[in-house]
């Protein structure tokens, strides 16, 4: 039996790769989780847009003096920091496009609210709420994919470490 290199060198090399794999998998997992910090807030804000849309219709129908205040609250929710973060480069295009459609349709809805066009609003509110629902669903799927990514990275790191420990 011939030893080609010292055991300490093999152990040092294996230890180095184990530490490197641990740092890489942990770092990527932490970056992914950091990008998830506002996911729940974004889903809650997006979901609240549904209720606010119906409230605006009620305000319009009842000629409520609260209509302008509620329009401003809707605008603030639509432009909240949690939703504005969805314009980042790493957010899937499906989420960005649904958010963009909500914005574009809000401009029309807001103009109709200002004009007091109740018939138009009643005819279009269900479609707008359906768009909100699809947006919330896209956000939920995006958040779930990030969790699965963290799981996959952690699993790959664990398998890599296991391989190094038992085959080095």
Predicted regions and their residues:
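Juxtamembrane loop-transmembrane helix junctions in multi-pass integral membrane proteins
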Residues: 2-9, 31, 35-38, 135-138, ...
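Alpha-helical transmembrane segments
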Residues: 14-17, 43-46, 153-159
């Amino acid at each position: 039996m011939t030893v080609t290199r010292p055991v300490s060198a093999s152990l040092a090399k294996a230890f180095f790769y184990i530490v490197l794999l641990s740092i890489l998998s942990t770092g990527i997992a932490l970056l992914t989780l950091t990008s998830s910090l506002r996911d729940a807030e974004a889903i809650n804000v997006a979901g609240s847009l549904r209720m606010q849309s119906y409230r605006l219709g009620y305000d319009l129908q009842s000629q409520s003096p609260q209509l302008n205040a509620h329009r401003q609250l809707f605008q603030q929710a639509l432009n909240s920091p949690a939703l504005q973060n969805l314009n980042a480069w790493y957010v899937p295009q499906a989420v960005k496009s649904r958010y963009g459609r909500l914005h574009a349709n809000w401009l029309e809805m807001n103009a109709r609210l200002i004009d007091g066009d109740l018939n138009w609003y009643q005819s279009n509110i269900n479609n707008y709420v359906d768009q909100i629902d699809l947006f919330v669903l896209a956000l939920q799927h995006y958040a779930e994919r990030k969790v699965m990514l963290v799981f996959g990275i952690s699993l790959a790191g664990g398998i890599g470490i296991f391989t190094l420990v038992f085959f080095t």
